[in-house]
Amino acid sequence: MAASRLPPATLTLKQFVRRQQVLLLYRRILQTIRQVPNDSDRKYLKDWAREEFKRNKSATEEDTIRMMITQGNMQLKELEKTLALAKS
């Protein structure tokens, strides 16, 4: 009998899509942080983002994850607005 090729903890389609949303949000946040002109502010924001994502890594509740994605998107928009104001 052939062994299953799937790892024991295979994600469902819904979990896979949520994971992709989280990873995309994380990448977008880090890309936006790279635009921060001050080195110390950039490092602080990068460390903050990394710590927030690590702290919530173990979340499994669907509603909680969806809420955190929404909050992350709002914080990303706020950061983008702040950077746009600083440049003008």
From Swiss-Prot:
Principal location: mitochondrion
Top-rank taxon: Eukaryota
A Pfam family recorded for this sequence: Complex1_LYR
Coiled-coil parts of chain: none
Localization, UniProt: Mitochondrion
InterPro entries, A to Z: Complex1_LYR_dom, Complex1_LYR_LYRM2
Gene Ontology biological process terms in this record: mitochondrial respiratory chain complex I assembly
Keywords: Mitochondrion, Transit peptide
Keyword Transit peptide: yes
CDD domains, sorted: Complex1_LYR_LYRM2
GO terms for cellular component: mitochondrion
Transit peptide boundaries: 1-19
Function (record text): Involved in efficient integration of the N-module into mitochondrial respiratory chain complex I.
Family from the record: Belongs to the complex I LYR family.
Protein name (Swiss-Prot/TrEMBL): LYR motif-containing protein 2
Gene source species: Pongo abelii (Sumatran orangutan)
Lineage: Eukaryota, Metazoa, Chordata, Craniata, Vertebrata
